[in-house]
Curated annotation (Swiss-Prot):
Keywords: Phosphoprotein, SH2 domain
InterPro entries hit by this protein: CEP152/SHC-Transforming (IPR051235), PH-like_dom_sf (IPR011993), PID_Shc-like (IPR006019), PTB/PI_dom (IPR006020), SH2 (IPR000980), SH2_dom_sf (IPR036860), SHC_SH2 (IPR035676)
Oligomeric form and interacting partners: Interacts with the Trk receptors in a phosphotyrosine-dependent manner and MEGF12. Once activated, binds to GRB2.
PTM (free text): Phosphorylated on tyrosines by the Trk receptors.
Pfam families: PID, SH2
Protein name: SHC-transforming protein 2
Transmembrane spans: none
Signal sequence, renumbered to the chain: none
Tissue: Expressed in brain. Expressed at high level in the hypothalamus and at low level in the caudate nucleus.
Alphabetized GO MF terms: receptor tyrosine kinase binding
Residues that bear Phosphotyrosine: 338-339, 414
Species, as recorded: Homo sapiens
Keyword rRNA processing annotated: no
Length: 582
């Protein structure tokens, strides 16, 4: 032994730390002796992998390693779920992922490289794991059959009873009582019942939960088809579907218990019976098989949900800013926030389209919203209903001779239609491009004048030759005429027009990008851009109360007189001209 300069032996090097033994997550829990379990046999057992391993080793269960000072009873380990004593893979379920993920790492030194096996372990659980208490012998059918064609059973349909309250608002015991009370009510109502059932007094507490009964198809032998899509009840001979319940519409299922060994009851919603409890009578031992198959279908459907959960709907990325409109550009949408529009207000009758050759309004609106396409043209090419009258309701699939045709302009809603909406006198001729009455009246007048030998002074020309009704105002000016005005900017989008406004009273006139020939007045009022249509569907330039000869006449009138344009309880002053760029 070598001594140092001071005669003392050098200190021995520290011993390396002992590696920590693998510890399950169960051993990290403190003892909880106050926990008492009345029926530990009903807990979830170990996974199928451990069961097969135990069977291969002679049927004896492997003994878990003795827990350290912080051990936990074996019953508490069973509560943690269907894991082996030493968990092999994390479970993708949210409630069990943390505990099983911690136990699967084995030691602290291996936690860094454990993330690579998470995906494979999760996929393995989705394929073999279970969160429903399986029968001792496992599921009755292969997963591929329940996922694919499904499983069918022949049972006897007992009818259904309306359930007035949502099953989510009831606890588990109340749900079970609801199904038993439904069986109790239908047991004597259906003749020829063969299943064993002990008649009980009606449960008055459930009077507000159960409603009327539907005994149609009651007592018939039917087929119940079970798959991950749902449950379907049908008559085997005629293949008539009694009920078809998708898996999300099924809220509760019960059956095969000690007091209802021959019956299966489940609560589901459908368009005919709404929320109802359907009762099935089964032969001996079949009720447990049906409930087990339903549980297998539920488990596989939930695993599909875990494997591909629905996408979360994200909010729109952009919101309406100070310089952009609330509905985007005109190229993006046909709905505009014109301030002289009122919901439900229709444009005046008339236009340059023959209403007898047009379709009804719903078809026209669809064509405007989605644009012309071969499918829409085929859908709208309906035969004429010669015998139909104007009293038929609109949109009944037939063309009405007096229906209003689709306008050849943007579908805007006007408020300044008092004059055009006023009823015309009964003797006023109706506007019709193909109306031949004015010419017939003129010929009759000429023939009468010749036959009577009229020698008096000739009548004015307009009285001798009646003409069809004319417009109330001139047609809107052409593009060449508007190009001479400094406030006209030609074809421009709403956003570009709004960006050119600086102060209240600034205005310009533009041509619509979506529908050329539709002229829009864009101005600034109270810091907000406003849009006003200047030409109505009949081609008349006007405001709410005044008709004008042209757009230039309208602008000059309000600009020189300082009068605001009033519409829809708002007003727009024209003070500053926004000149177009040269």
């Amino acid at each position: 032994m070598t001594q140092g300069p001071g005669g003392r032996a050098p200190p021995a090097p520290p011993a390396p730390p002992e590696p920590e033994a693998p510890t399950t997550f169960c051993a990290l829990l403190p003892r909880m002796p106050q926990w008492k379990f009345a029926a530990p046999g009903g807990f979830l057992g170990r996974g199928p992998a451990a069961a097969r391993a135990a069977g291969a080793s002679g049927g004896a269960d492997p003994q878990p390693e003795p827990a350290g000072p912080g051990g936990v009873p074996a019953l508490a380990a069973a509560v943690l779920g269907a894991c082996e004593p030493r968990c092999a893979a994390p479970c993708p379920l949210p409630a069990l992922s943390r505990c099983r993920g911690a136990g699967s790492r084995g030691s602290r030194g291996g936690r860094g490289a454990a993330g690579s096996g998470d995906a494979a372990a999760a996929a393995e659980w989705i394929r073999k794991g279970s969160f429903i208490h399986k029968p001792a012998h496992g599921w009755l059918h292969p997963d591929a059959r329940v996922l694919g064609p499904g499983v069918s059973y022949v049972v006897r349909y007992m009818g259904c009873i309306e359930v007035l309250r949502s099953m989510r608002s009831l606890d588990f015991n109340t749900r079970t009582q609801v199904t038993r009370e439904a069986i109790n009510r239908l047991h004597e109502a259906v003749p020829g019942v063969r299943g064993s059932w002990k008649k009980k007094a009606p449960n008055k507490a459930l009077a507000s939960v159960l409603g009327k009964s539907n005994l149609r198809f009651a007592g018939m032998s039917i087929s119940i088809h079970i798959s991950t899509d749902g449950l379907s009840l049908s008559v085997p001979a005629t293949r008539q579907v009694i009920a078809n319940h998708h898996m999300p519409s099924i809220s509760f299922a019960s059956g095969g218990d000690t007091d209802m060994t021959d019956y299966v009851a489940y609560v589901a919603k459908d368009p005919i019976n709404q929320r109802a409890c359907h009762i099935l009578e089964c032969c001996e031992g079949l009720a447990q098989s049906i409930i087990s198959t339903v549980g297998q279908a539920f488990e596989l459907r939930f695993k599909q949900y875990l494997h591909s959960p629905p996408k979360v709907a994200l909010p729109p990325e952009r919101l309406a800013g100070p310089e952009e409109s609330a509905w985007g550009d005109e190229e993006d949408s046909l709905e505009h926030n014109y301030y002289n529009s009122i919901p439900g207000k229709e444009p005046p009758l008339g236009g340059l389209v023959d209403s007898r050759l047009a379709l009804t309004q719903p078809c026209a609106l669809t064509a405007l919203d989605q644009g012309p396409s071969p499918s829409l043209r085929d859908a709208c090419s309906l035969p004429w209903d010669v015998g139909s009258t104007g009293t038929a309701p609109p949109g009944d699939g037939y063309v009405q001779a007096d229906a209003r045709g689709p306008p050849d302009h943007e579908e805007h809603l006007y408020v300044n239609t008092q004059g055009l909406d006023a009823p015309e006198p009964e003797d006023s001729p109706k506007k019709d491009l193909f109306d031949m009455r004015p010419f017939e009246d003129a010929l009759k007048l000429h023939e009468c004048s010749v036959a009577a030998g009229v020698t008096a002074a000739p009548l004015p020309l307009e009285d001798q030759w009646p003409s069809p009704p004319t417009r109330r105002a001139p047609v809107a000016p052409t593009e060449e005429q508007l190009r001479q005005e400094p406030w006209y900017h030609g074809r421009m989008s709403r956003r570009a027009a709004e960006r050119m406004l600086r102060a209240d009273g600034d205005f310009l006139v533009r041509d619509s990008v979506t529908n050329p020939g539709q002229y829009v007045l864009t101005g600034m009022h109270a810091g907000q851009p406003k849009h006003l249509l200047l030409v109505d569907p009949e081609g008349v330039v006007r405001t709410k109360d005044v008709l004008f000869e042209s757009i230039s006449h309208l602008i000059d009138h309000h600009l020189q007189n300082g009068q605001p344009i009033v519409a829809a309880e708002s007003e727009l002053h024209l003070r500053g001209v926004v000149s177009r760029e040269p």
